[in-house]
């Protein structure tokens, strides 16, 4: 476990983030639906076996990644996932990503609430100074969602990650602890808190 960020369960209103377990494989297998919706996200699990493998990989090195199941508290369903990764306690930084949701909750308050919980925990409880987001440069939906959180676009990282048979150019976004108070207030207004 990351001693710095820990693995606390985080909750607000309709959303609970709790650490994944392998027992979540069946529920996770129902999240993706049409894999074409996730063409920019390599390796999304589409059945119970690939979900189990995905969860095992997500849990393999908890000092570098903390994977959360996103639960919709209105019905208790697992509706997606999000993670801290590239955790660097020495520099008080981490990335937020490995995020995907079932189609029925996309465009709702689920994602902004989940991201608010991760950012609040990192900045306010753990003293983070910088959080970053990475996405494929052509993933317009993800880029718009990250920008709406209040993160600043910092540039493109060429040949940053493998992507299929080639390489991905990554759009890099970041938020610092100096940015957080304003972003927090806008996010709380957005999610109705």
Indicate where each model-derived feature is located.
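GNAT-family acyltransferases
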Residues: 1-110, 121, 125, 160-193
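Conserved GNAT acetyl-CoA-binding A-motif
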Residues: 124-134
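Conserved beta-strand-loop-alpha-helix junction that forms the acyl-donor binding cleft
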Residues: 133-143
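Conserved catalytic-core motifs of GNAT/GCN5-like acyltransferases
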Residues: 134, 152-166
């Amino acid at each position: 476990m990351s001693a710095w960020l820990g693995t606390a369960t985080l909750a607000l209103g309709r959303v609970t983030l709790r650490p994944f377990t392998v027992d979540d494989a069946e529920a996770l297998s129902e999240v993706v639906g049409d894999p074409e919706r996730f063409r920019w996200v390599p390796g999304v699990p589409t059945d119970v076996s690939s979900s189990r493998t995905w969860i095992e990989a997500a849990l393999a090195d908890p000092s570098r990644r903390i994977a959360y199941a996103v639960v919709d508290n209105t019905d208790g369903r697992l509706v997606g996932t999000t993670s801290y990764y590239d955790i660097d306690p020495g520099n008080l930084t981490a990335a937020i990503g490995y995020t995907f949701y079932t189609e029925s909750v996309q465009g709702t308050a689920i994602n902004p609430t989940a991201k608010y919980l991760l950012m609040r925990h990192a900045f306010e409880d753990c003293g983070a100074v910088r959080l970053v987001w990475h996405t494929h440069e052509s993933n317009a939906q993800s880029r718009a969602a990250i920008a709406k959180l209040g993160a600043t676009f910092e540039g493109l990282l060429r040949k940053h990650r493998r992507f299929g048979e080639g390489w991905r150019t990554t759009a890099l976004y970041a938020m610092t602890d100096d940015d957080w108070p304003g972003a927090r207030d806008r996010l709380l207004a957005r999610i109705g808190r």
